[in-house]
């Protein structure tokens, strides 16, 4: 873990609000299913690294999870200090709470636990949304779960690594014609900066072609790490001036002023 430079814990409503206040267009959050079938927002595979509890999210009810301190285990010096201990009690939100807190914001929902039932519960919430709210949601996760969601909806923006790879390989073969394969419709694409120039029409035409089929292009730093972000002013200079899509960052507080000057 890095030494804290701000007072926010990930996957909490205060940290999401801070991101939006700094100018984020979309915020990413992680979902896991609780023992009582609620969608908790939490990243780690188990609770013991962040909290004082042990086990998985699915072993607890949401009421029990609300009692935990999600800042309990945060340490940047091997356990000498715990700067967030005592400050994260009750901060683990549900998806419903996030949706209520940000009723008009775009959200990127990452299903973390790989449990098919999690996708079913999530779909129950998505299908009850208005068309406008539905269009603000994007979901990514494992191959089987995302394929199942595609069966439920042809228009929900989705992403899995297999889906993305298949669609982009097709595009590499035919993109010179301007045609966008149906495999790339209604998606989110995480495109590594190092490989992006291989795509036909990159950057401007490619982004426009994807936008025309309801696909969001997210540029990530480096060579393919899923959430490698443009987290320094220097890294932002590597973004092509003509790029009009989305940029992944884990430090919008640092880079938003630089990104804003590019617009």
List the predicted regions and their residue ranges.
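Phosphate-group recognition and catalysis centered on beta-loop-alpha active-site segments
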Residues: 1-263
